[in-house]
Amino acid sequence: MTQQAVLALLLTLAGILPGPLDAQDVHQSPRLTIASEGDSVNITCSTRGHLEGILMKKIWPQAYNVIYFEDRQEPTVDRTFSGRINFSGSQKNLTITISSLQLADTGDYTCEAVRKVSARGLFTTVVVKEKSSQEAYRSQEPLQTSFSFPAAIAVGFFFTGLLLGVVCSMLRKIQIKKLCASGIKESPCVVYEDMSYSNRKTPCIPNQYQ
């Protein structure tokens, strides 16, 4: 287990201890979430009673405001999370989605109900893990398979055609040899038969020198 995960678990255990009274008015979930680089996490902040808006802060390792959300108003997002924050729901039950996670996003996040007497929940610990080489290989494996399968088919057809060509060539040579052999046997018979037939039809001419 990484040091970040151990630290996150310790912080979560510490959060189980009784918190301040104002935490009873703001409920936040989950208490711990672990994700890989590039993934997304959801943090839900719900509260009751009158409030002006919801402020989510990062309180560890560095403290600063992440977002401020108010119904019917344009939300404010810290530039560190620009383009990576989405909202769903109302300010009394708000789900905040942080996407394209980075290692620097690891930390504790707390929701605060903004009103005359502000109240905040405990916190949500977000742990962002470095993407392992195995996960990267799995993400590339379907792409490699899609390329290798057509290639295997093409190679298979190539060798099949090559084998059929060799077989046809061998059969053709055997057939030619058989035809030649049969021609050699039959041609003398035909020639001799013709010659004997012609000899029978040709009259005898006496030799004048005898």
Swiss-Prot record:
Its main location: membrane. Residues 1-23 form the signal peptide. It is a single-pass type I membrane protein. Disruption phenotype: CD7-deficient mice are viable, have normal peripheral blood and spleen lymphocyte numbers, and have normal specific antibody responses with antibody-driven Ig isotype switching. Deletion of CD7 in T-cell progenitors permits normal T-cell development and homeostasis and only minor alterations in T-cell effector function. Micece are resistant to death in both the high-dose and the low-dose LPS-induced models of shock associated with a low number of resident effector NK1.11/CD3 T-cells in liver. Disulfide bonds join C45-C111. It is found in: Membrane. This is T-cell antigen CD7. The gene is Cd7.
